[in-house]
């Protein structure tokens, strides 16, 4: 059976994305990324935030002096990103392109792709294409940093479980269904209160977890070598029950 999603959609998700992600801590994640590259003695130079969503990390990187621009496949996500950048008085370029077919104006020195964006590609061929496109525009010696949800997380944490998120802005029911090939089908129901009435909107998409061997092999085929693997937000090797792994790959 084939599973797919259309990232150009996310109409409802884009409206509530920031509310659901308010505990991510983008400033802390930005500092973490900067520290990784500091330890590698790498000048980020011209950088790309791939699958940037509503631009929260892009904005934090820009605030910290990184020459960065963002790409996402969702017009709706990018609309919010542009508004937020303007509110922060920042001039950031945002482009609407799919990960697996990015076409940049020139080369880059660094690419970051965070918060399980790679997992949204449920076809291995699309992951390979994404790695190859990033490699095509990456200067030799440049770095590609991304994170990925693990098979453990998909099988043991998300699985067939349901989660509820209750914020000041929205009430969300997050339902997961574990399918073949470590794919999780995700159904989101958003309930927004206006007076005494609740309005419901729904969104659904799929994510796929890949093994370390699969990701490493695809990176090598694209001309990268993995130089670091960390447990999320740490500088230690991933544990057996790690839910998200950070990959740092260098362009050969």
Which positions does each model-derived feature cover?
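Conserved class I S-adenosyl-L-methionine
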Residues: 1-51
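Class I SAM-dependent methyltransferase SAM/SAH-binding core
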Residues: 48, 56-101
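A short acidic, Gly/Pro-enriched loop at the edge of an enzyme's catalytic core
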Residues: 103-110
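Residues lining the SAM
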Residues: 114-116
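SAM-dependent methyltransferase
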Residues: 125, 145-218
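A short glycine-rich, Lys/Arg-flanked "PGG" loop and its adjoining helix->strand segment in the class I
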Residues: 128-140
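C-terminal lobe and adjacent flexible extensions of AdoMet/dcAdoMet transferase-like proteins
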Residues: 212-252
């Amino acid at each position: 059976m084939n599973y797919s999603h259309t990232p150009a959609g996310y109409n409802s998700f884009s409206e509530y994305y920031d509310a659901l992600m308010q505990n991510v801590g983008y400033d802390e994640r930005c500092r973490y990324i900067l520290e990784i590259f500091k330890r590698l003695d790498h000048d980020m130079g011209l950088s790309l935030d791939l699958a940037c969503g509503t631009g929260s990390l892009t904005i934090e990187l820009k605030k910290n002096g990184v020459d960065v621009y963002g790409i996402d496949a969702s017009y709706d996500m990018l609309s919010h990103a542009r508004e937020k950048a303007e509110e922060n008085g920042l001039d950031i370029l945002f482009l609407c392109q799919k990960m697996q077919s990015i076409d940049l104006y020139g080369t880059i020195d660094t690419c970051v792709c965070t918060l399980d964006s790679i997992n949204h590609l449920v076809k291995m061929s699309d992951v390979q294409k994404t790695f190859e496109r990033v490699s095509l525009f990456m200067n030799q010696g440049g770095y590609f940093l991304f994170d990925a949800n693990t098979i453990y997380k998909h099988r043991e944490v998300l699985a067939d479980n349901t989660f509820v998120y209750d914020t000041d802005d929205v009430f969300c029911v997050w339902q997961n269904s574990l399918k073949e090939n470590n794919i999780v089908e995700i159904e989101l129901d958003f309930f927004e209160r206006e007076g005494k009435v609740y309005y419901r909107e729904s969104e659904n998409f799929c994510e796929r977890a890949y093994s370390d061997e699969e990701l490493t092999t695809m990176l090598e085929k694209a001309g990268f070598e993995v130089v670091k693997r960390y447990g999320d937000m740490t500088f230690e090797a991933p544990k057996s029950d790690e839910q998200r792994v950070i990959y740092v790959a260098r362009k050969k």
